[in-house]
Amino acid sequence: MSKLKKVIGDVDVNKGLLFLLTIGGLYSLGIALSNTFVNVYLWKQSGKFIDLAIYNLSIVTMQPITFYLAGRLAKKIDRVFILRFGVIFLAAFYLSVLLAGETAASRLVLIGAVLGVGYGFYWLAFNVLTFEITEPDTRDFFNGFMGILSSSAGMIGPIVAGFVISRLENNTGYTVIFSLSLSLFALAVVMSFFLKRRESKGRFMLSKVFGERHSNMNWRRITNAHFFQGLREGIFVFLISVFVFIETNSELALGTFGLVNSAVSFFAYYFASRLIKKKARKKSILLGGLILYGALFLILFHMSFSTLLTYGVFIAIGYPLLLVPYVSLTYDVIGRARHARKARIEYIVLREMFLNAGRIVSILCFLLIVALLKEDVGIPLSLAILGIGHPLIYYFVKDIRFKEKEGENETMEEDGQKRVTEPTLLKGER
């Protein structure tokens, strides 16, 4: 334990937090191995950006619907079961892509819907468990360390998958990689049995939580911020990987891009989680947002593998600066909101609805612009307009404030014991 302290710093961790980090790490590796190449796999069959946009639109449309259904279920059954449902649907997605083979591009809506359902179930459960297991003093550590695990997976997964796919003939490499991802998902399910049961009672109060936007300005600001976060993520999540493949025509080059991006991100997340203090959260969010938008201009007018790699380095620095304080800020806003203990699931669901609403609007705008203009004009224009989403996050979070009155810095745990929260300012391309 003393050696662990030297690595993570002066942070008190419990078994539940460590198990949740392990599950998140397994998920990240499974996704990093396979998901990086799905858009390229479909691109090689279709060759149309509009088709990729429709596929991703199906994903982000099903996610909020599934979040709503998962939220209602989580009021009746253990959240860990919801987590397992998500992993099962993710496994079904990779199996469906594998079984569809060369006809996958003709089933874009169905395949995307399955993945959207998997994401919805998994992330609802993971986010709720994160809120319940972490505390204000450990949230920055958890978010930062989760970023380190994701970055580690991002380094290992794409380069390994790219090497295997490029070395094996036909679709054999995809079969191997998808099978390995399924094994990691299965292990994540096994690890979930070590999590303490955390039942939630009561009725689903989504309408009341939505109504809180009228009386709780912090909640209104943070949900608006999530809409604009989704505005960028909607199209960037699938365009960049395809750009790399188009420039290089190599899955191994795409894996190299992922390796470089994640290697930088690994260190950036580590230092962000250790160095960004609560009073500096908003400045960090602004700096991260500006870096992410500024990096876009590296590839907007001239695109090559070298400029894409440079872009990858800059966003690997920008995302930790933005997300580590931003995600912690979000969870602290929820933790101090009315009925936070009873309605934590509803708060998570509504947050995701705003995030995915931004993604849906992003992809719809992209489809409209590309349909009206040629791709060589429409795509750069879409990137320039929709990429502004991350800098705009700061506009909404800059005025978030917390009162410091007696009794307001306490929230109640499920077991009825008080969890003291500090009077702070107050918790992410997929």
Swiss-Prot record:
One of its GO terms (cellular component) is plasma membrane. Keywords: Cell membrane, Membrane, Transmembrane, Transmembrane helix. The chain crosses the membrane at residues 18-38, 49-69, 80-100, 109-129, 145-165, 175-195, 235-255, 256-276, 285-305, 307-327, 353-373, 377-397. The keyword Hydrolase does not apply. Its main location: membrane. Disulfide bonds: none annotated. It is a multi-pass membrane protein. Residues 415-430 have a biased composition (Basic and acidic residues). One of its GO terms (molecular function) is transmembrane transporter activity. Residues 407-430 are annotated as: Disordered. It is found in: Cell membrane. InterPro entries: MFS, MFS_trans_sf, Sugar_transport-like. This is Uncharacterized protein YqgE. It comes from Bacillus subtilis (strain 168). The gene is yqgE.
